[in-house]
Amino acid sequence: MCRLFASISKKPENIYYWIAKAQTPFKSFGEKRLNGGPHNSGWGVAWLVQNKWRIFKEGKNNVRKFHFEKINNLQSNIFLVHLRHASIGAETTKNAHPFIYKNWVFEHNGSIDRKKVIKYLDEKFIREIKSETDSEVFFL
């Protein structure tokens, strides 16, 4: 199962601190071999800036190591972080969470039947699918 973290605060927080520098940083939960072992298929963060969502994500197949430091200066009062343990879809950046559609963001833990969900999607949402994951299909 994936690892999810979210924060809402009155004042902007340094996202990197919570992911990599806190006494028990969030990234450490991805390194532990709990429930299926390391969550190193990909990672991503979504944060809100002036009422617009921004996303940074990386997939294991696209980088040698994860670059958590690339978000070192990000500040936001709302953010979501996801450490992926792939079950469906390759370990690529496009399959890393969170996903964005218009002004909505989504991250997911678990598995659903992708083909069954696609049957119920309107064609306009099917055209929006960018990943191979069940999660993005469920989101749309």
Segments and roles (model prediction):
Residues 1-60:
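Extreme N-terminus nucleophile/cap motif
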Residues 2, 104-116:
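Conserved beta-strand-loop-short alpha-helix elements that form
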Residues 9-10, 82-85, 109:
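Fold-independent oxyanion-binding glycine-rich loops
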Residues 15, 55, 89-91, 114-117:
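Short helix/loop capping segments that flank catalytic or ligand/cofactor-binding pockets
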Residues 29-30, 59-70, 81-102, 120-122:
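Short acidic (Asp/Glu) patches
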Residues 39-43, 49, 74-76, 81, ...:
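Short, basic and Ser/Thr-rich N-terminal targeting/leader segments
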Residues 45, 110, 138:
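Residue-level signal for inorganic ion chemistry
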Residues 113-140:
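Short histidine
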